[in-house]
């Protein structure tokens, strides 16, 4: 019998790309795999048993309901539990006391993130960040292993728990068709969070200096910010498509000429260092789109190193427009950038390079409890 593993999220949707389509689907090829997720019907996805837990969408109310998560998790009776949300760290301790193995997957640098949370009074941010860091250390030092998505967070987590690895958020590679020189209206695009940190207001200002229109898709995070965008005289040049299911995002990319990912500098991404946890840039590259991206150190290594786009200051609409105009006015260069990006994802920045790290960590934590451990292709990664 294969070991049983259980991923738990109280915040992310059951169809989260990283959690379900990458980690859980990969694990289901080797383990009896469960995913506990909020407010969904029980179902099966490529061998993954999805189990719904009724939870409030209100942050404070949800804290009072975490007992439901714990009870459901213990009903699954897994050998290993993999947690995805900071609010679940106390649940992880309770599970650990039952003799189970626990992994925590840190998607964000929460202590740094708290320093910029707009909903928190400014005076409270540093004390709350410090308190969270202490609680995080208390919990995570007792877990069996930690996972994160980018080097800066990995460095911090290894000081808490040496058994920490990086499993980056690269896409599962699939060749998406794209062509240039189609004629007609040209577009820049973004599919993801409609949130201020992705600098959509700067994109709108850049449209004054280019003929491109903006294809925009994604969930609105703050209504006031979305309304601010809609009040702009440039909103008429935006085609907002709402939230697209994953299988329709590729069609958006096929319509576009340039992919934009202008993530703001912030403590959560190490300011100018940047993060590898943002999937969007690699999706554009996989789709054969030239990218215009924030000039983070990590992103410049990718974009400039593979000559697949241009990096700019995300606060400078003139720089954004200049980059877009350069790409749109040189279709041969755009085609080469797109080809370079796709090749880079096919060979380096894809989930197939990360899956062995995840599976190797599981095998190590579980103590080689695979049903056929002697034949495991991942034993050399322990």
Where are the predicted features?
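Conserved donor-binding/catalytic core segment of Leloir-type glycosyltransferases
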Residues: 6-8, 147, 177-215
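Conserved acidic donor-binding segment of nucleotide-sugar-dependent glycosyltransferases
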Residues: 305-306, 310-317, 326-332
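Short hydrophobic beta-strand element within catalytic cores of glycosyltransferases
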Residues: 259-261, 283-286, 290-293
């Amino acid at each position: 019998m294969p070991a049983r593993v259980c991923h738990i999220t109280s915040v992310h949707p059951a169809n989260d790309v990283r959690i379900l389509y990458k980690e859980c689907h990969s694990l289901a090829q080797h383990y009896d795999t469960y995913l506990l997720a909020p407010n969904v019907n029980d179902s099966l996805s490529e061998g993954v048993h999805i189990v719904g837990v009724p939870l409030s969408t209100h942050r404070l109310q949800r804290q009072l309901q975490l007992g439901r998560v714990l009870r459901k998790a213990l009903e699954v009776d897994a050998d290993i539990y993999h947690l995805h949300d900071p609010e679940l760290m106390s649940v992880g301790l309770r599970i650990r006391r039952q003799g189970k193995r626990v992994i925590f997957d840190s998607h964000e640098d929460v202590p740094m993130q708290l320093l910029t949370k707009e909903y928190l009074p400014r005076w409270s941010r540093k004390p709350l960040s410090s308190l969270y860091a202490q609680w995080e250390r208390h919990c995570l030092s007792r877990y069996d292993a930690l996972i994160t998505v980018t080097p800066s967070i990995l460095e911090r987590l290894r000081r808490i728990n040496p058994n920490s690895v990086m499993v980056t958020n690269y896409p599962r590679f699939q060749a998406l068709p794209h062509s240039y020189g189609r004629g007609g209206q040209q577009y820049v695009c973004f599919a993801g969070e409609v949130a201020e940190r992705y600098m959509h207001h700067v994109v709108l200002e850049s449209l004054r200096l280019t003929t491109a229109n903006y294809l925009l898709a994604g969930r609105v995070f703050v209504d006031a910010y979305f309304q601010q965008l809609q009040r702009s005289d440039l909103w008429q040049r935006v085609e907002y498509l709402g939230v697209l299911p994953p299988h329709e995002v590729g069609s958006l990319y096929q319509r576009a000429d340039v992919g934009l990912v202008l993530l703001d500098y912030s403590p959560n991404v190490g300011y100018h260092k940047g993060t590898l946890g943002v999937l969007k840039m690699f999706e554009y590259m996989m789709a054969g789109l030239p990218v215009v991206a924030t000039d983070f150190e990590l992103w410049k290594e990718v974009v400039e190193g593979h000559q697949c786009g241009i990096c700019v200051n995300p606060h400078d609409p003139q720089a954004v427009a200049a980059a877009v105009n350069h790409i749109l006015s040189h279709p041969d260069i755009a085609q080469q950038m797109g080809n370079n990006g796709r090749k880079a994802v096919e060979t380096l920045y894809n989930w197939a390079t990360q899956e062995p790290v995840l599976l190797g960590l599981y095998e190590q934590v579980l103590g080689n409890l695979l049903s056929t451990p002697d034949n495991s292709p991942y034993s050399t990664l322990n």
